Structures are given as C-alpha cells and as structure tokens.
Amino acid sequence: MASDFLPVRRALLSVSDKTGLIDLARALVARNVELLSTGGTAKAIREAGLPVKDVAELTGFPEMMDGRVKTLHPLVHGGLLGRAGVDEAVMAEHGIVPIDLLVLNLYPFESVTVKADCTLADAVENIDIGGPAMLRSAAKNFARVAVAADPAQYADLLVELEANDGQLSAAKRFALSVAAFNRVAQYDAAISNYLSAVADSAEAVPTRSPFPAQINSNFVKVMDLRYGENPHQSGAFYRDLYPVPGTLATFQQLQGKELSYNNLADADAAWECVRQFDAPACVIVKHANPCGVAVGAGCGDAYELAYATDPTSAFGGILAFNKTLDAATAKAILDRQFVEVLIAPDYEAGALEYATKKANVRVLKIPHGNGLNNYDTKRIGSGLLMQSADNRGMSQGELSVVTQRAPNEAELGDLLFAWRVAKYVKSNAIVYAKDNRTIGVGAGQMSRVVSAKIAALKAEEAKLTVAGSVMASDAFFPFRDGIDAAAAAGIKAVIQPGGSMRDGEVIAAADEHGIAMVFTGVRHFRH
C-alpha cells in the first residue's frame, strides 16, 4: 500500500515542450529539490540561473547517437522503479539514487506528422524512445514516484506541494500515473496510425492511405450521461482527442439539465445541417431528422418558417441556428414551445437572460469553425465500418437538366436548398421546399413513393401549400410512381441523383407533368 504523502527531494526534468518549465524548476529549487536533466532542458534551466545536474553525470554515460540514447540506463530507471521498503539494499549496492518526480513530455511526433510535407525520416526522428520508457517506469511506481507528462499539470502539482510542505499525496500520484499511461497510449497510437498508413510507400514524402492497416482511436470522456438511448442502457459522451473546430464536440453548455444520449445525437444532426448555410438559418430536429428548416432575413424569420413546417414534431425538438441568437427570437421560441436543446455559435446577453426563465432548457454554444469531419464510423457486431465523411456539396453549375423544361432561377435556388436538407434526412428521404423553407419532409421509409406521400401529408397537416414547390430525393427514383405522386401534390421541379435503370421512364413522367428535373450525379443515403 502506498504511503499517503511522500516528499519530493529529487526530480528529473526532460521536456520537448518547455512551456512553464522555468517556473516549475524555480519552484522546485526553492523547496531544495535536486534537479536532474538532459540536453536542451538542462541548458534552459542552467541559462535561467538554476542549479541542475546532467543525467550523463549521474550515469557516467554521455548522450550519444545524436541524442537517441540519453536516459536508457539502470541508474535512471532504477531510480524511478525502486520500491520503498523493498529495493533500498540493491539500490545502495549499485549506487542508484531514488527519483521522486519525473517531469517529461515527448518528442512532438503528432505535430510533425500532421504537416503535409513531413518526410518519413522526419517522422522517424520524432519517435521518442527513452521518454515513453521513463513515463512507464515512473507511472508504474506511483506508490513512490509522481510523474507530470503535460505542462497543464504543473500548476496543480505546485499547489499540492505548497499545501503539503513539499509532499504529494497518493491520490495525486495515482491520478498523474493514469494520465501518463494515457499519454503513452495516445503517443503509440499516433505512431502506429502513421506508419500503418504509409507502410507500402517508398516516397520521401509518403502517400498516406485513408484506411490504414490498423487504426487506433483515442477519445477522452467529457461526461457521464443519465442513460443511453433508452433508460435501461447506460451511456457516456467521449470527445475525440483532437476535435475538429466547429463540430459538436467543441460545445460549451451555458445552462440547462444534463445532456442525454439522444440530445447529443439529435444536436449533432441539427448542427451539421445548419452550419452548411451562409444566410441566417434555423434547423429543428426530432429523432435525428430535420422536421423544419428555413433560411430567413434573421434568426427570428428563419425560426418562424422552420417551425411552421411541422409544429407538432417541433415540440421537444432540438433547435440550431448558424448566427448569434438574439433576445427576441429566444423569447419567441421559449414562450411558444418546449425545447430540449438550443444551439448557436453565440447568444446576445438578453437571449441568455431570458433562457434562465426556462432553467431546464439546455443551451449550447459552439464556436464557428470551418473544419469538417474527415470520417464517419459505425459499430457493427465486433467490427467497425469506416468511410470518408459525406462532405460533398453541390453548385448550380454541376446540375444536369434532363427534362424538356428547365427550372427557373427561383426553382433552382429552392432545389439547391432542398438538396442540402435532404442530405440530413434519413433514407428514403423526400423534401418539399419553396422560398428557402421546407414545406414537408418524408423520412426513413422503406419505399421512396411513401416518403413522397408523407411529405405531402405533413404539408397538409401544417396547412402549407405544396403547389409550386420543389422536391429533393436523396437517391434515384426506381419507378415513375414517385414523380406521379409529386405531380399530384403540385410539385414543379425535382432534384435527384439519377442513375436508375428506369431514368428514361422517370424523365418521361416528369415531362408529362410539365415538371423540370435536374440530376446531381451524387447520392446522399443516410442510415
């Protein structure tokens, strides 16, 4: 059993990132801690006017092989691994002095290899060998030794030393040990991922496979959740170690109840949909499907139009905006309906003040960022499906008009709007839209024609006029029945991928009804 508090009398410092190094070293020296160090770290400490002993002086071995061998020595690892009450005799026999604190961060492999022009030689030279070995030695012996693997840990470390007369508690040593082992695991995973991706490349700047022979993922827990998708399931939320700027995982919760599994899944769908629009937009999501989407002159206008698509489904929904949410819109929302989550890149002070009247509403702030997710993954039984993320946009110039009548400018704008929305609706997906707002959404049906009929039914329930609207379909129409259903509802233009064996039949149906139709050549299945 580890002693609760143990003094720090000797520390070994060896860091690539020298953030906070001198302040830490100065504080340790002030407590009469003997400093051992290597290479550039020792040089920096010495230049700050602080006493430090080179590890080479301790071991009697110089640094060699351009610094590849510095600390791989029994006098170093024995000093870290020696057990109190067990190994004192053998340590004394071999002249091994105990090291109580290791401060070490690793060669910057991740930041070097993220550069597009990184050569294989550059990558290999930034694979740390002695560093992970020392981290593991110190972390294994947390019963006696403390280890700091990140400059962010220095402040808390010094606070505990100050509060306990130069001693560290067993709880602190254990927590630091876990963090060190996690850091080594992350580091080794980064090396494995990189080398697995370039395994067969002989180029100086190797080509990297998007799907390497082995993948190692690192996620850190953000929070426990009340439960999973259902109350009998447990759940937690983990964030990617390096989250993409602007994605959901970068959120800050400003108020409200704890988030649920379903809250986060729906919030991701809403946020990814709304952030693709440049003009002020609102997306309302229920069960991971947009039930109302609109672009307007401002947030308030966009919300009113999105809400009108399906007021019933909007109850208890997730609302996302791509612009700063103003106080008037926040009041209009919260006075009208029950909301699970509000999402925006920022909020006016008045909006946040009014939101406090509904203390249970979860208010999330997600800073703007242009980053896109690179991959989508899905767990299956004992396996993982991995694909490049569906980041494919669509411009007017990419559309192919396939009918006798071409869409007019207003219809083209609505077609592209509906296409953006359809990308985030579960397949089979049909979206009716007009004037940059959804009129009806048909989602998740096994038959495409049924989705088309549901979209018309939802519009009718909301007392919205389908006549003159456009229709987007996430995949091709296998038969003409979907076009016939759209015509019966009053649809005037259609956007779809094309590619069916019966495209000719579908195009003929559109011509019969005087419908303009464009092909994108891109499918947006979503399961």
From Swiss-Prot:
Keywords assigned by UniProt, alphabetized: Hydrolase, Multifunctional enzyme, Purine biosynthesis, Transferase
One Gene Ontology MF term: phosphoribosylaminoimidazolecarboxamide formyltransferase activity
Lineage: Bacteria, Pseudomonadati, Pseudomonadota, Gammaproteobacteria, Lysobacterales
Organism: Xanthomonas axonopodis pv. citri (strain 306)
Record note on domains: The IMP cyclohydrolase activity resides in the N-terminal region.
Chain's gene name: purH
Protein name, UniProt field: Bifunctional purine biosynthesis protein PurH
Pathway: Purine metabolism; IMP biosynthesis via de novo pathway; 5-formamido-1-(5-phospho-D-ribosyl)imidazole-4-carboxamide from 5-amino-1-(5-phospho-D-ribosyl)imidazole-4-carboxamide (10-formyl THF route): step 1/1; Purine metabolism; IMP biosynthesis via de novo pathway; IMP from 5-formamido-1-(5-phospho-D-ribosyl)imidazole-4-carboxamide: step 1/1
Protein family (similarity comment): Belongs to the PurH family.
Enzyme Commission identifier(s): 2.1.2.3, 3.5.4.10
Domain MGS-like: 1-149
One of the GO biological process terms: 'de novo' IMP biosynthetic process
HAMAP family: PurH
Catalytic activity, reaction form: (6R)-10-formyltetrahydrofolate + 5-amino-1-(5-phospho-beta-D-ribosyl)imidazole-4-carboxamide = 5-formamido-1-(5-phospho-D-ribosyl)imidazole-4-carboxamide + (6S)-5,6,7,8-tetrahydrofolate; IMP + H2O = 5-formamido-1-(5-phospho-D-ribosyl)imidazole-4-carboxamide
